[in-house]
Regions:
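Conserved hydrophobic "DFG−1" position in protein kinase catalytic cores
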Residues: 44-45, 52, 124, 144
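A short coil-to-beta-strand element that immediately follows conserved catalytic motifs
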Residues: 17, 92-102
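A short Gly-Trp-Pro
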Residues: 67-72, 121-123, 155, 159-168
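A generic structural micro-feature
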Residues: 34-36, 112-118, 134-139
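Conserved Nudix-box catalytic region and its N-terminal flanking loop in Nudix hydrolases
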Residues: 45-87
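Acidic, metal-coordinating catalytic segment for phosphate/diphosphate chemistry
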Residues: 1-41
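Active-site-adjacent beta-strand/loop module that shapes the phosphate/pyrophosphate-binding cleft
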Residues: 102-131
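NUDIX/MutT-family hydrolases
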Residues: 133-164
Length: 172
């Protein structure tokens, strides 16, 4: 956010970033808050296996990820889960069967801008493993991995690593 200098209201080069969440103009008192964006991630389970995706774009290209993404305006977290799973994997779910597990803060760096996110983790059970029709612009492949074989070093995002540390140790 340090790269933004010109005020969108008055046009002067007087825009200042407070280092955390706010841009403000010294000239006209314009204020723009850079609030948290909501994002969803879905643990799709079949027995003791979890479906993970491999990212085909930055950030975290080539790393493992849970299916999900950002919520759209006027969309519930459950609706975002259903939309993202349809977009990324071409599967349809019953949103009422999602179980919310945990929320964690995260920083999502995109094109040299850090976006603060609140990642909302859900669980969704399926009776049998499935093949997905992938949106290769987002997902290069899927893998069904036994939960005790998940390597946290291969997970793309810190919030998901923290999530899996808690999730995988939930019964201990």
């Amino acid at each position: 956010m340090d790269e933004l200098h010109f005020c969108p209201k008055c046009g002067e080069e007087t825009l200042n970033w407070d280092g955390e969440k706010k841009l403000s103009c010294n000239q006209c008192s314009f204020v723009l808050y850079h609030n948290c964006a909501a994002a969803v991630a879905v643990v799709i389970r079949c027995g003791n296996e979890i479906m993970l995706t491999k990212r085909s774009q930055e950030p975290g290209k080539g790393k493992l990820d849970l299916a999900g993404g950002f919520t759209d305006p006027k969309e519930s977290a459950e609706e975002a889960c259903a939309r993202e799973l349809k977009e990324e994997l071409d599967i349809e779910i019953i949103p009422e069967n999602l179980k919310i597990l945990l929320t964690l803060p995260n920083i999502y760096r995109y094109k040299d801008i850090d976006y603060n996110t609140l990642d909302i983790f859900f669980e969704y059970h399926v009776d049998k493993k499935f093949d997905a029709k992938l949106d290769i612009s987002e997902v290069s492949e899927i893998a069904w991995i036994y939960e005790n074989e998940i390597d946290l070093n291969e997970i793309a995002f810190n919030s998901q690593k923290k999530f899996f540390q808690k999730y995988l140790n939930r019964n201990q």
